[in-house]
Amino acid sequence: MEAVIKAFLTGYPGKTSKKDSKEKPLATSKKDPEKTPLLPTRVNYILIIGVLVLCEVTGVRADVHLLEQPGNLWITWANRTGQTDFCLSTQSATSPFQTCLIGIPSPISEGDFKGYVSDTNCSTVGTDRLVLSASITGGPDNSTTLTYRKVSCLLLKLNVSMWDEPPELQLLGSQSLPNVTNITQVSGVAGGCVYFAPRATGLFLGWSKQGLSRFLLRHPFTSTSNSTEPFTVVTADRHNLFMGSEYCGAYGYRFWEIYNCSQTRNTYRCGDVGGTGLPETWCRGKGGIWVNQSKEINETEPFSFTANCTGSNLGNVSGCCGEPITILPLGAWIDSTQGSFTKPKALPPAIFLICGDRAWQGIPSRPVGGPCYLGKLTMLAPNHTDILKILANSSRTGIRRKRSVSHLDDTCSDEVQLWGPTARIFASILAPGVAAAQALREIERLACWSVKQANLTTSLLGDLLDDVTSIRHAVLQNRAAIDFLLLAHGHGCEDVAGMCCFNLSDHSESIQKKFQLMKKHVNKIGVDSDPIGSWLRGIFGGIGEWAVHLLKGLLLGLVVILLLLVCLPCLLQFVSSSIRKMINSSINYHTEYRKMQGGAV
C-alpha cells in the first residue's frame, strides 16, 4: 500500500518495481503522456514562482478562469441514455462500469431521427418478397418491407458527428428478433438485423470478434494503403449466442427462387452460387424442394398457389428451389467504408446500436461485424416503477372483498391480568359465564399487546433498514469511484489488496420480504365488527354494500317470521289452556254456588 501511495504522490500511475524505485530516480518521458507527473516537480515549482514574481513586478494580472465542473455522473448517464435505472457489476476489474441492462428491439420510425439525419425520407427503400422471387412469373406477389431496409437507410443518412467514439456498454444480453410465423401479420421489428463490412460483402458472417480483428489487421480496407485504417469491431463478445436465426429471427415458410444455371465443364454457375455437382443436389442438400423447368410449383403453405418455373435462356439443369427456413434479413450488409461512417455518428436519445451483449449510444467509426439492430435498453427485472404501472393498468375485476374486520387502534387496553388457579376453579364451577367473559377479555388485551409490540418492532426494523440502505449506497458509490480512479491511473488488481474482489453482502431483499411479512402478520389481528355482513360477503362474493344491508334486513325479517312460526303454536296453546282453565274455574264456581244455595233452602 505504501508503494501505491508513493507512486501516486510522485505522479507516476504506471507500474514500477521496488528495485527500480530504490536505485534509480523516476524519470519522465515527453513522448508518453501517461508518464507525465501528476504533481509539479522541483523545476516546475521554480518556473511557477518566477512567473508569479514577474507578473507582480510588471503589474500584469490575469483573471483566473475556473473550469466548469462536470455534472453528476449518474445524471449525465440518464440524460445521455434515457435510462432512469441501472446497476453496476464488478465481474471485471478493468470494466468497473459494466451494466446489468439488456437490449430489446424497438420499432423504428423516421420521426425519431429528425435532426440526426440529412432527410427522413425512407419510403422508397424497396420491398422483400416472402413467397416467390421476382424472376418466377405467375405466382403471388406477397411483398413487405423488412425493418433492416429502413435501418440501413437511416444509418447511411446520419449527419451528426461526435467528438469522440461513443462509449461501449457491456450488456447481460439482448432479446432475439421475432420469427415470421404469420405472413399476413409481420412484426414491426422483424428482419431488423444489419451487418457492417467493407464493400458490403457477407464475408464476415459468423466470425468471432478476435478472428475478425486479426483479419482486418492483416488485410486493410484499401489495398493501395500499406497500413490498416482504423476500424471498430461490433461483433458480440459471445458471438456464438447471438447469431443465426436464433437471434435475427427466421422465416417460417419456404421461399421459392429460380436457379438459372450455366455449365462450364464439371462446374455450374447459378447466379451468385456456383460449384461442382448438379444444382438439384445443392437444393435438396439444404433441405429444399427442387422443381425443374418442365413442371409447375404447387404449394399449400402459407397459402395455396401454382406458378410456372419458366424463364428466358434456362439451361437444361435450371429449375426452381423451394428453400427451407431462411434467416432474416436476407442480405442486410452495410458498406462501412462510406463517408457517413468515417467519423462516429450520434443516434437519437434512448436509441442504441445493440450487437448481442454490446451496445453503443451512437455508431462507431468504420464499424465491422454484427449482427446488430437498433433498440432500447431495459433492466433484466422490472423495477419498482414498472411494477406500480403494471398494477395500475391491470384489471380490477373479480376481486374478492375482505371481511369487515377493523384493526386494533392505539387506544386499546394492553393491561393483561390473568387469574390464578383458585379464581379459575371457583369461577368455572360457580359462575361459568363469568369465567368465559374474563377469558375473552384477557384474549382481547393480549391481542392489543401483541399488535403494539409488533408495530414497535417493525418501526425499529424499518429505521434500521433505511440506515443500512443509505450506508450501502454510499459504500458502493465510493468504491466505484475509487476503483475507477485507480484503474484510470494504471493501477491493476495486483497493486491494492482486495481491489478486484469486493464482497459486500446484500440481504436487503430478504429483509424487505420478512419486514413486509411482519407487517402483514400484524394485520391478521383484528375485531370483526360485522360478522353477519362478513358471512354474507363470503357467500355471495363481491356484492355491494347496499346489497349487504338489504340481505341483512331480509334475513332479520326471516328470523322474526321463523320465531313467530315456532313460538305462535306454543303461545296459542298457552292462551287456549288459560282460557279453558278460566272457563272451567268459572263453571266450577257457579256449580259450587248453586250447591250452597240448594243446601241453604
Swiss-Prot record:
Region Fusion peptide: which residues?
420-440
Gene Ontology annotations for the cellular component aspect, listed alphabetically: host cell plasma membrane; membrane; viral envelope; virion membrane
CDD domains given for it?
RSV-like_HR1-HR2
Which residue spans belong to the Cytoplasmic compartment? 576-601
Q: Which domain of life is it from?
A: Viruses
Q: Which keywords has UniProt assigned to this entry?
A: Cleavage on pair of basic residues, Coiled coil, Disulfide bond, Fusion of virus membrane with host cell membrane, Fusion of virus membrane with host membrane, Glycoprotein, Host cell membrane, Host membrane, Host-virus interaction, Lipoprotein, Membrane, Palmitate, Signal, Transmembrane, Transmembrane helix, Viral attachment to host cell, Viral envelope protein, Viral penetration into host cytoplasm, Virion, Virus entry into host cell
Statement: the UniProt record of this protein carries the keyword Nucleotide-binding: no
Mention any Pfam family matching this sequence.
TLV_coat
Q: Where is this region: Binding to host receptor?
A: 186-229, 264-289
> According to the Swiss-Prot or TrEMBL entry, at which residues is a lipid covalently attached (S-palmitoyl cysteine)?
567, 570
Q: List, alphabetically, the InterPro entries matched.
A: RSV_p95_env (IPR005166), TLV/ENV_coat_polyprotein (IPR018154)
Which chain regions cross the lipid bilayer?
555-575
Q: Extracellular compartment: which residues? A: 63-554
Q: Which cysteines are joined by disulfide bonds?
A: 87-501, 122-153, 193-248, 261-270, 355-372, 412-448, 493-500
Give the record's glycosylation annotations as residue positions. 79, 121, 142, 159, 179, 182, 226, 260, 292, 298, 308, 316, 383, 393, 455, 503
Q: Region Immunosuppression: list its residue ranges.
A: 476-492
The processes (GO biological process) annotated in the record are: fusion of virus membrane with host plasma membrane; symbiont entry into host cell; virion attachment to host cell
Where does the signal sequence lie?
1-62
Cite the position(s) of the site with description Cleavage. Answer: 403-404
Coiled-coil stretches are: 437-487, 505-535
PANTHER family in UniProt: ENDOGENOUS RETROVIRUS GROUP FC1 ENV POLYPROTEIN-RELATED, VIRAL ENVELOPE PROTEIN
Q: Which family does it belong to?
A: Belongs to the Alpharetroviruses envelope glycoprotein family.
Per its record, how is this protein called by name? Envelope glycoprotein gp95
The protein's organism comes out as: Rous sarcoma virus subgroup C (strain Prague)
